[in-house]
UniProtKB/Swiss-Prot annotation:
Name under which the protein is recorded: Gamma-glutamyl phosphate reductase
EC number, as in UniProt: 1.2.1.41
Function of the molecule: Catalyzes the NADPH-dependent reduction of L-glutamate 5-phosphate into L-glutamate 5-semialdehyde and phosphate. The product spontaneously undergoes cyclization to form 1-pyrroline-5-carboxylate.
Transmembrane segments: none
Catalytic function, reaction form: L-glutamate 5-semialdehyde + phosphate + NADP(+) = L-glutamyl 5-phosphate + NADPH + H(+)
Amino acid sequence: MNALNIAEYTHTLGLQAKTASAQMARAPAAIKNKALLALARLLRQNVDALQGDNARDLERARAAGLAEPMVDRLKLTPKVLETCAQGCEQLAAMPDIIGEIQGMKQQPSGIRVGQMRVPIGVFGMIYESRPNVTIEAASLSIKSGNACILRGGSEAIDSNKALARLVAQALAEAGLPEHGVQLVQTTDRAAVGQLIAMPQYVDVIIPRGGKGLIERISAEAKVPVIKHLDGNCHTYVDDPCDIVMAVQVADNAKTQKYSPCNASEGLLVARGVAAQFLPQIGAVYAAKGVEMRGCPEALAILRAVPGVQLAEATEADWSEEYLAPIISVKVVAGVDEAIAHINRYGSHHTDAILTRDHMHAQQFLRDVDSASVMVNASTRFADGFEYGLGAEIGISTDKFHARGPVGIEGLTSLKWVVLGEGEVRT
C-alpha cells in the first residue's frame, strides 16, 4: 500500500470500529459469553492449523537472525493456545460489570447520585511478537463491550491473521458485529502512525512491546495511551527470611521462563543473609546456566560456587531487562537500601520481598513505587490470569486510569448517573 491507501484503509477500520462499538456496548452478557466460549472451542479445534501458520513466522524470524528469547515469544505451543482458551472461558464465567451502578447516595437536594461502569468505546492495541496477545485483547474487548483495532508485529503476521479469523468466526456465531474486533492486515509501519492519530475513532491506544515502540507511541499519539513498559523486576531477599523458601522463589522468579516481562532481572540480598543465601542460589543458577552479574561483595561470596557464571555488574546492569538467563545481583544493607535501589533502577512493574519480618513487608508494600508489590511470592505471578482477571491486555506501568495487569475493569470508565423526581436547583 502507498501512504494514501494506508490512510484510507486505517480510517475505514476506525469508522467500522466506531460503528461496531455501539452494538458491542449494548450486547447482553449472554451474547458476549457465547462469543467467548465459541472462541475457546475454535482455538482447541484448530491447534494443528494454528501451529502451521505459526511455523512460518518462526522460520522467518530465525532466518532474519532474531534472538532466541524473541523467537520464544512468537511460539504458539499447544500449552499457549490452551491457556488462551482457558482465559476465554474464565472471562465468560466472570460477572458482567458493564452497566453496574455503584456508590448511589441520596443528596440533601433530593437527587440520588452514583456512577455507572461503561465501555471505553474503541481501543487500539499495538504489540510486538507474542501472537497470543491477539486472543487476549480480543477476548477482553468482547467481555468489556468495546470494539478494538489490533496491530501485531510483522514477525507474527501469519499467526495473527489466523487467530483473527477465528475471532471473526466466534463473533459471527454469537451475532456480534464482524468489525467488533479488527486486525490491521498490513505490516507497513505507516499504519501505526495513522492508528494513533485518529481521536475521532479511537478512544485509547495500548502499546505493548519494546521500549522503542512505547516511546514512539507515547510521543506521537494524539489519543490517550496506556503504556506497558519494561519489566525490570526485582526480588529482594531480606534479613530475616526463610532461606529454603527464598531459594525456591528466587529460582522460579528468574528461571521459570526467561522472556516474560514479569521475570526477575535483579536480585537484591540483605547483607545479614548473603553468606548463607548466595551460595545456595548460585548453585541453582549454575545448574541452569544463569549468568550472575554481581557487585564486588556478591562476587566475593559467589566465586566459591562451582560452575557458576560470573561477571562484574556495570551501572547499566541495574536497569537492564535481560529477557535471558542473566541476572544482576547486589548485596544491600537492608530493606531501606533495597527499596531505594528498586525505585531508582526498576521499571515500576513488579517487585517482591522475601521476609519473615512483618514490619519490613509492610514498609516494602508501602514504599516501593511499582504496579505490583509482593511478599513471599514469585514476580512471575504478576499476570492477569493469575490475578483472576481472565486474560490481560498488558501490564500498565502508568499511574493513571489503569495500573498493573489490565483486565476488564481497566477497559472501562465510569459515568455519573443522577436520579431525581423533579428536583430543581435553587
